[in-house]
Regions:
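Short aromatic/hydrophobic contact patches that present stacked aromatics
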Residues: 16-18, 54, 99-101
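Aromatic-acidic/polar surface patches that form glycan- and anion
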Residues: 10, 20, 102
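Vicinal oxygen chelate
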Residues: 2, 23-25, 82-111
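Core-facing hydrophobic residues within beta-strands of well-ordered domains
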Residues: 11-14, 97
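A detector for short, charged/polar N-terminal pre-domain segments
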Residues: 1-9
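A broadly used, surface-exposed interaction patch
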Residues: 72-83
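Core segments of cupin and vicinal oxygen chelate
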Residues: 20-72
Length: 111
C-alpha cells in the first residue's frame, strides 16, 4: 500500500463543518439544549447579513452554522434529501451535504 501521508500540511482532522440554518434560535436550542453541545463562539457577519456560530462536538472539533438574513429557501432533492430513508429518494446534488453523523458510544443512544 502506498504511503499517502501529507508531508506539506499536517492534517489533524476536521476543525469544523459549516451548515446553513433557517432559524438560529431553534438551531441553538436543539444543539445546545437537546444534544448538550456547548455554544462556544458567535460571530456577527458584516452589515447585519447574518451570524456564524460554533458548537463544541468534542476532540477540539466544531459544528458550525451560518444564519443569513436573506437566504433562499431550501431545495429538497437538490440541497437536501427529499425524504427519510425508506420513504423516497435520498439523492442530493453534487456539492450538497447529505447528512452528518456523530460518533457516540453505542450505550448512549437508542438505535
Amino acid at each position: 500500500m502506498l504511503d499517502r501521508t501529507n508531508s506539506e500540511f499536517e492534517f489533524r482532522g476536521v476543525n469544523h463543518l459549516a451548515l446553513v440554518c433557517k432559524d438560529m434560535a431553534k438551531t441553538v436550542r436543539f444543539y445546545r439544549d437537546v444534544l448538550g453541545m456547548p455554544l462556544i463562539k458567535t460571530i456577527d457577519l458584516p452589515e447585519g447579513s447574518g451570524q456564524h456560530f460554533f458548537f463544541d462536538i468534542g476532540n477540539g472539533d466544531s459544528l458550525a452554522f451560518f444564519w443569513f438574513a436573506n437566504a433562499p429557501e431550501g431545495a429538497p432533492g437538490i440541497a437536501s434529501p427529499q425524504a427519510l430513508p425508506g420513504h423516497g429518494s435520498m439523492i442530493t446534488a453534487h456539492g450538497s451535504m447529505n447528512h452528518i453523523a456523530f460518533d457516540v458510544p453505542a450505550d448512549k443512544f437508542d438505535a
